[in-house]
Amino acid sequence: MILKSFILGNLVSLCMKIINSAVVVGLYYGFLTTFSIGPSYLFLLRARVMEEGTEKEVSATTGFITGQLMMFISIYYVPLHLALVRPHTITVLVLPYLLFHFFWNNHKNFFDYGYTTRNSMRNLSIQCLFLNNLIVQFLNLFILPSSTLSRLVNISLFRCNNKMLFVTSSFVGWLIGHILFMKLVGLVLVCIRQNLATRSNRLLHSNMYLVSEFRNWTARIFSTLLFITCMYYLGVHRVKLPILTNRLKKTSEIAEQKKSKEETDEEIEKTFETKETKKEQQEFTDKVHSLYFEEQEDPIEEQGYPYKRNETKEKRLGKEKTKDEFHKNIPKYETLDLDRNQEKKLELTILKQKTNLVWFEKPLVTLLFDVKRWDRPLRHIKNSRFENTIKQEMAQYFFHTCTSDGKQKISFTYPPSLSTFFEMMQRKISLCTIEKQSPENMYNHWLYTNEQKRHNLSNEFLNRIEILDKGSSALDVLEQKNRLSNDENKQECLPKMYDPFLSGPSRGRIKKGYSTRRIMNDSSASTKGKKVWINKIHGIFPIDYVQLEHKIDTFLDESLSGESGTSFPGESAPLKGLSLSTDKKRIDSENQEKSLKFLFDVVTTNPNTQTRDKESILIREIHKRVPQWSYKLIRDLEEEEKETEEEPKQVFGIRLRKGKRVVIYTDTNDKTNTDTSTSTPSNPAEEIALIRYSHQPDFRRNLIKGSIRSQRRKTVVWELFQTNLHSPLFLDRIDKTFSFDIYRIMDLFFRSWMWKEPELKTSKSESEVEEKEEKVKKQKEKKDENERIAIAEAWDTFIVTQAVRGLMLVTQSIFRKYIVLPSLIIVKNIGRMLLFQFPEWSEDFKDWKREMHVKCTYNGVQLSETEFPKHWLTDGIQIKILFPFCLKPWHESKLRSHHITHEHEMDAMKKKGKEQNFCFLTVWGMEAELPFGYARKRPSFFEPIFKELTKKIQKVKKICFLVLRTFKEGAKGLVKVLKEKASWVIKIVLFIKKKIKELAKIFFFGFGLREVEVEVYESNENGKDSITNNNIINELPIRIRSVNWTNDSLTEKKIKDLADRTTTIQNEIERIKKEKKILFMTPDKNVSPNKLSCNDKRSESQKFFWQISKRKGARLIRKWHYFFKSFIERIYIGIFLCTIYIPKINAKLFLESKKNLQKFFDKSIYNNETNPDGIDETNKNAVHFISTLKKALFNISDKNSSISCDLSYLSQAYVFYKLSQTQVINKYDLRYVFQYQGAHSFLKDRIKDYLQTRGIFHSESRQNPFRNSEINDWKNWLRGHYQYNLSQTRWSRLVPQQWKNRVNQRHRIQKKDSQKWHSYEQDQLIHYKTKKNYAVHSLPMQKEKLKKHYRYDLLSHKYLNFEDRNNSYIYGSPLQVNGDREITYNYKTHKSKSFCTLGGLTISDYLKEEYLIDTDKNSDRKYFDLGIIYFSLRKNIDIKAWIDKNIGTNTNININKKIKTGNTFYQISDKKNLFDLTISQQRNSSNQKTKKTKKFGFLDWMGMNKQMLDHSISNFEPSWFLPEFCLLYDAYKVKPWIMPTKLLLLNLDTNENIRNQNENIRKSNKINGNKKQDFRISSNPKDYLELDNGTPKEKEKQGKVKGNLGSNQKTRENLGLDLRNQQKNVENDYVGSDIKKRRKKKQFNNNKETELDSILTNYLVFQLRWNPFLNKGIMKNIKVDCLLLRLINPKEIAIDSIQSGEMHLDLMSIQRDPSLTKLIKDGIFVIEPRRLSIKRDGQFIKYQTIGISLVHKRKYQTNRGYPENKYIDENDFYGSISQHGKMFVNGDENHYDLIVPENILSTRRRRELRIRNCLNSGNTENRNPVFFDSTNVRNCGKFLDEDKYLDTDIQKLIKFKLFLWPNFRLEDLACINRYWFDTNNGSRFSMLRIHMYPRFIVS
C-alpha cells in the first residue's frame, strides 16, 4: 500500500508539474489565440477561394505565419515591440500600404510580367502576396470575438519565469490551432466546390466570362472588407485625422495677438527693478531656460503658468515659436550664475535652433500625433480657481517600495512627493555609488538599530528616574520640548506657526494664493505690485528682504531654484525691491550670522486666524507630472463673459450641459422704448441670470467642441434620439421593437388639444376616500410636472423648434386678440339683433380690451405686453393671458368661473373664494393653466342658453305634472267607488249561487235519485278555493257550474282559471293518497260510503304518525354528518381549553420568576468575554431557563413595584440543584462562574464535587493560569487602576456610533415612580442585555453586525478597564469613578449603565464648556426621552425648589428651607420623579497657596446656581429679550438633549409683556456691593444659601443698571464659569471667547438693539431655519412683481393677483428689520438647535483626557469630591493633567503626578519607548529587566511624603491611571482599526503586539 501510494503521489505531482510548466501553459494560451479572428485571415481565405495556384497559397500561408511569429517575438523583444505596437509605426505603415493595395487590385497588369521559364517564386505577385499577409498581421486588428484572446499571451508572460520558452511554446500552440483551422476551412471549401460543380457545371462551361467576373468580384469584395476594417480601426483607436477637424490656438498664440508694446513694458516692469540691455536679457534667458527646463518631471505649466515646459514638449506640440515669444513668459532670475553653467551652452544652441523650426522641418510623427491636441475625445477637467485644466492632487493610493521593519515591502500609501524626490536624487547620484544590501543584512541592521535606540532611550529614562531618587527637582528632570528661539537673553521663542520643531495643527495653515488667471491679469497693471520669485525657505520667513538683498546667494541652489519656487503677488512696499541679487561673491562668516538671524525674524500675523495678512504665498512642491492640455480652452459661459473684453473670442471651447440662461433681474437706469417689441436700452444693463439645466442626460457635456467622439464600448444605441445608454446585458429586458410612435409625439406636441379625461368616483368610507384622493392628487401633480418638463425639453431637441414655436405663439396671440375675438363679438351682437335683443357692444369690447397678452420667459417669468425676452427665438417664449376674454350670450348672467378644471383645485378655490384670472397660450391657440400643460375646456357660448331653456322647460313640466297629479287623484276616487260597487255585485252573485245550490239539492232528492258527488267551487275572500270531497261511487262526477251572471268579466275569467288549475292539482293529490293508502288499509269493503270504520280510523292515525317519523328520520339522516362533526369539535374545544388554561397559569408564573431571577444569575455569570467555543451568542441566555423556582423564590405582589435584587437568602445547594435540573442549560456559560476569581472562596467542596461529576465544573478550572504571561502582566496592570472617569457623551464618540444610538433608542426609562437605589458594592456588575433584546428580534445580517461591533467594543473596553479582586466587569460598565456612589437599577428593561443618562453620573460630564460635541454627529443620539422633562423655568426659584437632599424621597421642599452645600449628594427630580440627577459639588478651598491654581468653576446647570444677574456667557441681566434663553443658554448649548426645544418658546410673549416683565425683574434684582461674593460653594458647612421668593438673601453689590445691560466686571471676574479664568490654550480654542470679545466692544442705547445683537451674537447656536412652505409663495410673489414693476398702472393687476392668490400679502408685510419674535410667531423662521464644534489640537485634548485621580475617602462623604487643579505653564508635563486631574491635597505645590514615571519623558518619546519595547516582544531574553522582571520593580515611595500628605489607605494609591499611549492619543485606544504606529502600512494595529508594563509598587 505504501508503495502504491508513493507511486500514485509521484504521478500526481508529475502531472501537476507538467500542467504548470511553461510549455503546456504556452501551448494552451497559444491555441486560444487562434480563435481571435482578424482581417489577416481574409487574405488566406482569398488565396484559397481564388484558386490562383499552390505557390500563392504557400506564400500567403508563409507570410501569415511569419507575421504572427514576429508578433510573438515582439512580446519578449522590446525594440521590436516598440516598432510594431506603437500607433505611430502602425499608422505610418498602414496608410501607404492601403494605397499600394488599392493600386495593386485595380492595375494588376502593371506588376504582371507574364509567365517565363524562371523560378515562379521570383514572381513579383507572389512576393507581394507574401508581404500582404505579413503586413496585415502586423496591424494586429481583430474582429471576432475580441482582442482579449490575443492578449492572453501578453498577460500570462508576466507570470512565467522562463519567458523565451513560454513565447516559443505559445507560437507552437498558435501554429497548431492555425493548421486545424485551415484544414477545417479547406474541408468546407471542398464541399462547396463539389456542390457547385454538380449543379452549375453546364452553366460555367457555356459561359466562361462569368467565371472570370466571379473571381474579379471576389477579389474586390475582399479588398473592400479589408479597407473598411482598417479605416474603422484607424479612426477609432489610432489617430484622429487632422484634415477633418479645425485647430485651436494655443495659449502662446493667444498671447501673441496682444499688443506687443503694452506686453513688453509690463513684463519688464514686473520682473526687473532696473532696465537692462537686450543682450543681458538674452544671456539671462538662455541660462534660465537651461536650468528651469532641465527636469521634465516638474513642469512649471502645471501650476497654471503660460510658459512651456521644455524642448521635448515644444517639439511635440508642433507649433512655431519664435525666440521672443518663447522667452517672454520665463521668470527672470537675476541671481543665477552663468559661470556655473558653461557646459549647457551647446544644449542652448540646439534648443534655439529647434524652437525656430517651421512646420515642414518638424518630424512627420509630430504632425500626425499630438497627444495634447484638443480634438482628442477626452474630458476637459479644469480647476475653476486656477487656469489649470486638471487638478494636481493625486489619489490616496500611491504604490512604491519602502523599507518597513527592515524588509522591502510595497506600500500603497507612499507619499508621491517622496517617490518623485527619490527618482530625482537617483538621476543626480551615480549608480556605482549605490550599493544594494541583502534582505538579511537589512533586517539585521534594522534589528540592531532599533535595539540600540531602545537601549539608549531606556537608559536615558532610567537615568532620569535615578536623578529623581536622589532628590533632584522635578523640573530639572523632566524632558524639555525643543523650541526655536532667536534671543538667548529674552527667552523668546518663535510662535507655534513658524516653529520648525513643531508639527501638526499648531503650525496653522497657509492660505492658497490668488488664481493664476488673476495673477496674469493683475500683472498687466503696474499698480498691482511686482511679481517676485524667491526660494521656498524665504517663503517661510519673508521679513528682512532689503538687508539680505545682495547676500542671499548661498541659499539658492540650482536644483532647488529650478524645482521649487514661490510666487508672491504682494502689494507691500518692501516687495518692490525683492529681486535677488546678482552679486557673485560668497557671503563671509559675518554675513552668515546676519542671514541666520534673518531666518528667525517673524512675519507679523494675526494670532487669532494664524494667516498671513500681507501677501499670499504659492509654494511649488515636488509632485508627480500630470498630463495637461496645452491649449487654452474656455467654456460657453466664459465666452459670453469675454464678449465685451478686448482679447479675441475663442471659436471653440468646451461643451457644457444643456441649459438656458434665465434672466431674473435687469438693472437699467435708462428708460426703454416701449413702442418696439425688441427695444434695447442705450447703455448695456446689468443682468442677474441663472442657468436652467435640462433634465435629460447629456452625453456631450465637458467634451471639446468639434472633437471626434470616442466609440463607447459595451454600450448600444439603437434609437434615433436615445436619452440613455444601455449595456448589452440588459437589452433583453428593454422593448426594442422599432416603431414610429406617432401617438407619443402627438401626445407631446398636440396635447394642448387633448383635454383631461374625467375621473371615476367610487363610493367608499370618507377616510379612505380622502386618503386616496390625497395620494392620487400628489401622484397626479408629480406626473403632470414630469410631463410638462418632458414637453419643454422636447421643444429643445432641435434649434429650429424654439423659433417655430415662438413664431406660432406670437401668431396665435395676434390672431386671437385681433381676429377671432372681435369676429365673435360681431357675430354675437348681430345674432342678438336678429332675435330682437339689445346688442352688447360696449360690454363685450370692454372685456376684450381688458385681456392682456404678457410676454414671459421660457420659465414663465412675466415681462410686459410689448417687451420680448432676450433671444426668445432661440431660448423660447411663453405668452400669458391675463383676464382672458370669454364670450357670453348676455352680461346679466353670473357664470361660474370656467378657469378651474381640476376638481381638487376647484374645491380649494371654492373654499378660498378665489379665481385664477390667467392662462397660458398654446401653439394651437388653446388655453392652459400652466406652461405645456393640458388645454382646459373653454365655456360654451350656448351653455347659458341651454340652461335657460332647461329652466323654462322644467317650469312647463312642473305645471303639467300638477295637472296630471290632479287627474290621477280624481281617477283614484272613481276607481274606489267602482270597487265598492263591484264588491256589492259579487255578494249578490254569491247569494244567488247559494240559493241555486240549495234548490238543486231539493230538486234531486225529490225525484228519488241516488246522491252523487257534487263539487262546488267557491271563491272565498282569501282567494283560495274550498273543495268538498266525497267518495266516488262508481259514477262520474257531475260538475255543477254556478250561474254566469256577468259574462266575459275579468273577475269571472280569473275565477275560472283558478278553478281549473286547482282541480288539476287536487286530482294529483288524490291519486298519490290512494297509492299510499294501500299499505295501511284493510281489504274489508266499506259498508257505508260516507263513514269510516274503526280500522280506517286506526289506519289514519298510524299513517299520521308514520309520516311524522319518516319525515323526522329523513331529516336526521340528512343532517347527521354535520351534527356529528359539530359534536366532536365541541368535545375537542372543551378539552383543549382545559389543557391550555393550566400551562398558561404556570407559564405566567414562570416568566415572572424568570424575570426576577435574571439579575441574580447575570451577576454570577462573567460573560464579558466572547464565546470561545463557537457557541452562538444568542444562546447565551439559555442559562436563564430556571423554570421551577416560580413564586417560591420571590413574592411578586405588584409587577410595577421595585424588585429587590438581594438573593442572599437562597442557599447554594438549592440554586445549583435547580441549575442541574435544567434541561437546556449551557454549561459553557457556567464556566465563567467557576473561573471567576472569587467563585472558589464561597463554593462549598461538596457542591464542587457534585457539579464536577455532572460535567458542569472541572477541577482544572480552579487554577486556570493564563497561557501568555504577557497577558498576565496586562491584567495585573489593569487590576491596579480605577475605571476612567470619562463622561458617557465623550465615550460615546469613541465607540461605534450608530450601534450605540440604536441601543440607546431601544432602552427607555419605564419605572417612573421608583426611587430605589442600590449600593456600588452590591451592584458593581451591570449586566449587558442587548444580546437578548437585539439578537432575538433582528435579522441574521444584523446579528452578524452586532457580534462584530460587540467584539470591537469588548476589546476596547477591556483595554481601558481592569479586573480586581472584588468585582468583574463586562461591557456595560459605567465609565466614571463610582466609588461609593449609588447607581440606578430600577428599570423593567435592563440596560447598560453606560447608556443611562444623568443617572448616577457627575453632572460635570455634561455642563463643561469644553464638552461641545461636533456638528457632524448624528442628531439621534438622545440618551433619554425628551418628552419626560418639563420644567417651569419662569423664575430661578423653581429650579432651586427641585433640589432634594434626601435620596429616594418624593416630597417637595419648601421655598424657605435651608440647604447645606458642603460635599453633599444632591438629587434633582421633578414632581413626577421621572429621572434623577447627581450633582457632584466641588469644594471651595479657602486656603489657596499658589496663584497658579486654576479656578475651577462651580457647575452651572440650567442656572441652578442662581447667579442670573451677571451670567458668565450671556453678559446680560435677565431683564432683556427672552429671559428663558438666558436661563437655559449654557446647558442647552453644551448638550442640546438636556431639555426639549419646546421649553425655549414656552414664555414667548409680545415685546410689551417682555419689557414689563424685564422691568419688574430689574427692580427686584438690585446689586449689592458690600460683600464680594464668590459663587462657588464654600467648604464650610455653615455656609448656606437661603431661598426666599426666588432671590438670595445675601446682600449683593448695589449699583445702577446701565444701558449696556450687565457690564459689571467685578462680579463677572469672580464667577467660576468665567472663560477668562480658564487656561490660555483652552480659551483660544473655545468658540465663545471670540464672541465675548466682540460683545465687550458693543454699547447699546435701547432695548431693540440689545435684542438684535443678543440674537446675532449669543444665540447663533440656535439655528434659524427658513420655513420650506414659504418658498412657493415667495416665488409667486417674485413672478408677479416682475410684471408689476414694468406696468405704468399696476393697480388693477395687483388687486386681481391678490384675489386670485398669486400674491401673498403676509409675505410682503415682512419689514426690513423685523423682530425675531414676530418672525417666529408668523412661522417664517423655525428655531432649531445646533451644536457647536471646536477645533481641537493636541493641547486641548490633553486637558480633556483622563488625568490621575487619587481621591481621599472621608467618612462624611457621600460622593467623591474633587480638589483643585494644578497647572504649570512652563513645561509640557503639566499638559498631561486633565480637567479632572486632582492632587492629593489642596494647595500643594509638590508634583505628585510623578507617580506615573513615564511622564518624565515627552509624549513623543513616551510613545517611542513603548513601541521599541514592543517591537522585540517575541524575544524574551532581550527584554528590559526594569519592565519585565518582577524583582526589579521600582519603588515609588520616594516620590511621596507619606507622613504628611498620604491617606491612611495606602493601597488606594495603587489605583492610579496610566495610559498605554500618551494622553492625547485616547481616541486611538478605542479605534481598533487605526494605524497606531505611524507606519505607512497597516500591519501593526493588532492588539496582540501591545504589551503592558507591570504596575509600580508603593512601599
Swiss-Prot record:
TM spans (from-to): 23-43, 64-84, 87-107, 124-144, 172-192, 217-237
Keyword Secreted: no
Pfam families registered for this protein in UniProt: Ycf1
GO biological process: protein transport
Record region (Disordered): 256-280, 1581-1619
Alphabetic keyword roster: Chloroplast, Membrane, Plastid, Plastid inner membrane, Protein transport, Transmembrane, Transmembrane helix, Transport
Major subcellular site: plastid
Keyword flag Protein transport: yes
GO CC annotation terms, alphabetical: chloroplast inner membrane
Coiled-coil intervals, chain numbering: none
Membrane topology listed for this record: Multi-pass membrane protein
InterPro entries documented for this protein: TIC214 (IPR008896)
Quaternary data: Part of the Tic complex.
Cited function: Involved in protein precursor import into chloroplasts. May be part of an intermediate translocation complex acting as a protein-conducting channel at the inner envelope.
Name of the protein in its database record: Protein TIC 214
Organism of provenance: Ceratophyllum demersum
Gene expressing this chain: TIC214
